[in-house]
């Protein structure tokens, strides 16, 4: 029950008889999947890391100068030179200075002077290139087991952590007691890494434009250079003062770290953890659930008494969490739990925790359910010790219907072409059915709530027949489409 503690939660229902479900995982959100005769699973994308990004260029932002040497020549004696000029570690500058009798020359005129100083970089920053194949996604999969301490953001024994990379996009997660779920994921970072560079300075990193990074007026060396002795543009951090006869002072500018922080104002800051860079983005995953099975299907129903351990908790997702404790004998057994109308005639709402079970007597079990809007009864156990709890859920069915439809339409837009199976004609039609169910399932469920299966089919046939006999082309097409969608959802989908 990992998703209960996360505000941004999406419910995805599988089509009856379907073997796969498409989901979209984003940071800060959680997805709960439900399918007929399959366990309810929670999926959360907890981390996206860039592993071992390649270094494009290193910039020096703080340096020191040592071993300053100056050589000068009188007029007509040629150009002065120093051996240090051949050493890449030194920064040198040639100048001309006035010479004469007062400073050791027999002729008056311009004489040459050269000054060199050893340039040592003390602090640098790096620009790294991140490729999609360097990204690693960490997902936690948690079945709705109902066990104690399995509620909220628990990452202990109840969840299975799996890693997704572009090289191994298909991964299987073994869920103890529930079988195996297969995930086929397609990473989508939303960033164009060809135009962006990660600028890393100490324990902070920013995402900057590639050309801006390459144009920085600072000493630099290629990313492949591990020695640090072949810095280019060393003169950008060095100032040679005006020469005087045989002397020339040279100074180094102070640390450029503050100036870089100012220049990076407004740039996207990237979080870091254990030396790895953390990114946002989303994963489009196709779940294959044919190897999953419900736990405790062979158990009999619990016949003893239940008690509610804590007050029923309402979540921010329109669901409730009931914490019950079995006081009877015969465990392990299934928990009889239903949500009924006030007349006890119709079963309403749904169980998010499918097939809740008790494994041990007097051991609390968490059950998540979604009650209908308005008044209803939550019935736990069987007679004579049956619990009957009244519950009222606030809200508007129409508003909830349109909100759910918008969320599902957004999900389908993100999934794009990965939601479709074009390998066969049957795959195309199956994909169409899943798309209709994902987007219009909420509207269909609200419009035909409580209507029998045969009546749904009859309504679909009538709407289609009216459309085929309409004289208005636009009305005819609209009614036929609505009728076909109604027929399909009525026949193929247990919405």
UniProtKB/Swiss-Prot annotation:
Species per Swiss-Prot/TrEMBL record: Dengue virus type 2 (isolate Malaysia M2) (DENV-2)
SS bond list: 3-30, 60-121, 74-105, 92-116, 185-285, 302-333
Region (Fusion peptide): 98-111
Residue stretches spanning the membrane: 446-466, 473-493
Keywords associated with the record: Clathrin-mediated endocytosis of virus by host, Cleavage on pair of basic residues, Disulfide bond, Fusion of virus membrane with host endosomal membrane, Fusion of virus membrane with host membrane, Glycoprotein, Host endoplasmic reticulum, Host membrane, Host-virus interaction, Inhibition of host innate immune response by virus, Membrane, Suppressor of RNA silencing, Transmembrane, Transmembrane helix, Viral attachment to host cell, Viral envelope protein, Viral immunoevasion, Viral nucleoprotein, Viral penetration into host cytoplasm, Virion, Virus endocytosis by host, Virus entry into host cell, Zinc
Protein's name according to its UniProt entry: Genome polyprotein
Note: Isolate M2 comes from a patient with dengue shock syndrome.
Gene3D superfamilies assigned to the protein according to its UniProt record, in alphabetical order: 1.20.1280.260, 2.60.40.350, Tick-borne Encephalitis virus Glycoprotein, domain 1, Viral Envelope Glycoprotein, domain 2, Viral Envelope Glycoprotein, domain 3
Coiled coil: none
Membrane topology, Cytoplasmic segments: 467-472
GO annotation, cellular component aspect: host cell endoplasmic reticulum membrane; membrane; viral envelope; viral nucleocapsid; virion membrane
Post-translational modification: Non-structural protein 1: N-glycosylated. The excreted form is glycosylated and this is required for efficient secretion of the protein from infected cells.
Glycosylation sites: 67, 153
GO aspect biological process, one term: fusion of virus membrane with host endosome membrane
GO molecular function: protein dimerization activity
Ranges of the Extracellular topological domain: 1-445, 494-495
Domains (record comment): The transmembrane domains of the small envelope protein M and envelope protein E contain an endoplasmic reticulum retention signal.
CDD domains: Flavi_E_C
A Pfam family annotated for this UniProt entry: Flavi_glycoprot
Keyword NAD assigned: no
């Amino acid at each position: 029950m990992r998703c209960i503690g996360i505000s941004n939660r999406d419910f995805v229902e599988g089509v009856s008889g379907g073997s796969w479900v498409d989901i979209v995982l984003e940071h800060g959100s959680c997805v709960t999947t439900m399918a007929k005769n399959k366990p309810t699973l929670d999926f959360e994308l907890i981390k996206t890391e860039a592993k071992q990004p390649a270094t494009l260029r290193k910039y020096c932002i703080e340096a020191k100068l040592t071993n300053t040497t100056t050589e000068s020549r009188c007029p007509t004696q040629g150009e002065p030179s120093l051996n240090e000029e051949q050493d890449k570690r030194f920064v040198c500058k040639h100048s001309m200075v006035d010479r004469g009798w007062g400073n050791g020359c027999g002729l008056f005129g311009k004489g040459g002077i050269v000054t060199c100083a050893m340039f040592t970089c003390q602090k640098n920053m790096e620009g790294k290139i991140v490729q999609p194949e360097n990204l690693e996604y960490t997902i936690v999969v948690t079945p709705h087991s109902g066990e104690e301490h399995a509620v909220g953001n628990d990452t202990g024994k109840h969840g299975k952590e799996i890693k997704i990379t572009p090289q191994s996009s298909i991964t299987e997660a073994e869920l103890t007691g529930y079988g195996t779920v297969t995930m086929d994921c397609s990473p989508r970072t939303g960033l164009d890494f060809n135009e962006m560079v990660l600028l890393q300075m100490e324990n902070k990193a920013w995402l900057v434009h590639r050309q801006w990074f390459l144009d920085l007026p600072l000493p630099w060396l290629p990313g492949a250079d591990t020695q640090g002795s072949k810095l280019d543009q060393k003169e950008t951090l060095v100032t040679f003062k005006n020469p005087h006869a045989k002397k020339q002072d040279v100074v180094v500018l102070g640390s450029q770290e503050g100036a870089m922080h100012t220049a990076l104002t407004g740039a996207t800051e990237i979080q870091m953890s254990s030396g790895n860079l953390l990114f946002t983005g989303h994963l489009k995953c196709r779940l294959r659930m044919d190897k999953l099975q419900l736990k405790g299907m062979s158990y009999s129903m619990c016949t003893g008494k239940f008690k509610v351990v804590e007050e029923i908790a309402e979540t921010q997702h329109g669901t409730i969490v009931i914490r019950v404790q079995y006081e009877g004998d015969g465990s392990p057994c299934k928990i009889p739990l239903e949500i009924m109308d006030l007349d006890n005639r119709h079963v309403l709402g749904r169980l998010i925790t499918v097939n809740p079970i008790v494994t041990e007597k007097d051991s609390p079990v968490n059950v998540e359910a979604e009650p209908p809007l308005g008044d209803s009864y939550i019935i736990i156990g069987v007679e004579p010790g049956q619990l009957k709890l009244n519950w009222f859920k606030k809200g508007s069915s129409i508003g909830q219907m349109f909100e759910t439809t918008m969320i599902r339409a957004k999900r389908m837009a993100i999934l794009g072409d990965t939601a479709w199976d074009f390998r066969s004609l049957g795959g195309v039609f199956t994909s169409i059915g899943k798309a209709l169910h994902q987007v219009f399932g909420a509207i269909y469920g609200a419009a035909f709530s409580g209507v029998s299966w045969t009546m749904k089919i009859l309504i679909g046939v009538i709407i289609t027949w009216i459309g085929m006999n309409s004289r208005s082309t636009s009305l005819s097409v609209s009614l036929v489409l609505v009728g076909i969608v109604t027929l399909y959802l009525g026949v193929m989908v247990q919405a």
